[in-house]
Amino acid sequence: MKIIKFLLIISFVLIINIQNLLADEAKMLKGLEIFNETAGCAGCHIMKAAGAEGNVGPNLDTVDLTEELVKDMVTYGLGVMPAYGEEGILTKEEIDIVSFYVANSSGK
């Protein structure tokens, strides 16, 4: 009986982890779409993970960014980068998703 309970617990934990991995993968794919198409980040930035070869903004392959830092930069802009949040270019949800994507793809 203890083995059955143990196996059920392990199965439950594995299912939860698989669901989280699938959710993260979906978020990464949506983030890539926002980066390349919706926001057009690829036009200015270099980032191998996105196939981006821009030449205006910083090379995102050479920096290790946190999700919060990316959110702030995308929302409020920095230098010549527009304020995608304040100017209504991206929704808060889109900013959250693209920030997750960049933070998990930059510096790699």
Residues of each region from the PLM?
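N-terminal export/targeting leaders of redox proteins
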Residues: 1-25, 107-108
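C-terminal capping alpha-helices of c-type cytochrome domains
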Residues: 87-108
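Sec-exported extracytoplasmic/periplasmic mature domains
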Residues: 36, 65, 75, 79, ...
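Sequence/structural segment immediately N-terminal to covalent heme-attachment motifs in c-type
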Residues: 25-47
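Gly/Gly-Pro-rich "capping" loops immediately C-terminal to redox-active cysteine motifs
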Residues: 42-78
